[in-house]
Regions:
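Amphipathic alpha-helical hairpins
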Residues: 1-187
Length: 187
């Protein structure tokens, strides 16, 4: 059977659905591991948004008269696995938070690419209701990525750099290390 753009769209939609469900399981560990209260709050907030993304994808399936089902997303699984490995490293607190931000942003960028593709394909096929739903999620993914950037640039990276290179003056004098010893993830 020859596949069409509609088939590719459904395949990508199933991939995104599975990715969001995997992230619902992974985000609590990121939140628990974060030492920065603001970073913890960002992960907790995005967990709630991610649950909403799952529900929205179910709405998109409904607009297409398709049953919601996922297709294992190897891409997000790999990103999550890399994040788990970083968590298992003995980072000091600020370094851990910087590594968590990097992991979170990898996931956000993956999702933004997926949603951008889904929106373009839905628009090309005239699935206007799906476009509207997917655009809402894409905007939330962009906002989550921006929030992580703000946290990284707002002191976490400087604090981690100050611990890594105490001989260098951090760009932000207010960036004080939160902790200096090695840190293992809370399980």
């Amino acid at each position: 059977m020859i596949k069409t753009l509609h088939d590719a769209f459904l395949d990508e939609l199933r991939d995104a659905y599975d990715a969001e469900k995997q992230l619902v399981k992974a985000l609590p560990k990121l939140a628990r591991t974060a030492t920065s209260p603001d970073l913890r709050a960002a992960f907790e907030s995005h967990l709630e948004e991610t649950r909403g993304h799952v529900a929205r994808l179910e709405e998109v399936f409904a607009t297409l008269e398709e049953k919601p089902r996922g297709k294992h997303c190897d891409g997000i699984a790999g990103i999550i696995e890399e994040g788990k490995k970083a968590i298992d490293e003995a980072f000091e607190a600020n370094g851990m938070d910087a590594a968590l931000i990097a992991s979170g942003q990898r996931a956000e960028h993956y999702e933004m690419a997926a949603y951008g593709t889904l929106i373009a394909w839905a628009r090309a096929m005239g699935h206007d209701e799906a476009v509207s739903i997917l655009e809402q999620t894409l905007e939330e993914e962009k906002a989550a990525d921006e929030r992580l950037t703000e946290l990284a640039e707002g002191g976490i990276n400087d604090a981690a750099a100050a611990v890594a290179h105490p001989d260098r003056v951090a760009a932000d004098e207010d960036a004080e290390p939160v902790g200096s010893g090695p840190r293992r993830a809370r399980r």
